[in-house]
């Protein structure tokens, strides 16, 4: 349902998020928006939680995709140190939210590579 491209990346890299919405509560949504939380600089939080044009995902075939640079996506300064990233998906009016059912309904954790 949720993958990253490339599979090996660091939080300082541009990467893509792919969301296969079939089989989720967003299966009939015409628009899907990427939302989430960045933990940075010793535990500070930056959140993106509204459906706005800059976090709208692009429908490609049967899935939604969004490429992002995390510091820009979360509005962080260039010297911010991102420690953790979490994402979830909403429809245009925010009435439907899809999170990680396999992890107790928490946001999807995106781990950077050790490489």
What feature does the model see in each segment?
Residues 109-115:
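Low-complexity, Pro/Ser/Thr- and charge-rich linker/hinge segments at domain boundaries
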Residues 5-20:
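Contiguous beta-strand segments within globular domains
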Residues 9, 22-31, 76-81:
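A short beta-turn/strand-edge loop motif at beta-sheet boundaries
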Residues 81-87:
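Exposed beta-strand face motif in extracellular beta-rich ectodomains
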Residues 14, 31, 86:
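Beta-strand-rich binding-surface signature
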């Amino acid at each position: 349902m949720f993958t990253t491209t490339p599979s090996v990346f660091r939080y300082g890299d541009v990467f893509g998020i792919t969301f296969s919405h079939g089989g989720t509560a967003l299966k009939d949504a015409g628009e899907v928006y990427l939302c989430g939380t960045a933990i940075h600089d010793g535990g500070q939080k930056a959140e993106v939680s509204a459906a706005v044009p800059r976090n709208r995902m692009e429908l490609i075939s049967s899935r939604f995709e969004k490429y992002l640079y995390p510091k820009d996506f979360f509005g962080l300064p260039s010297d911010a140190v991102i420690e953790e990233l979490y994402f979830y998906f909403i429809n245009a009016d925010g009435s439907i939210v899809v999170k990680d059912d396999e992890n107790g309904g928490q946001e999807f954790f995106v781990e950077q590579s050790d490489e």
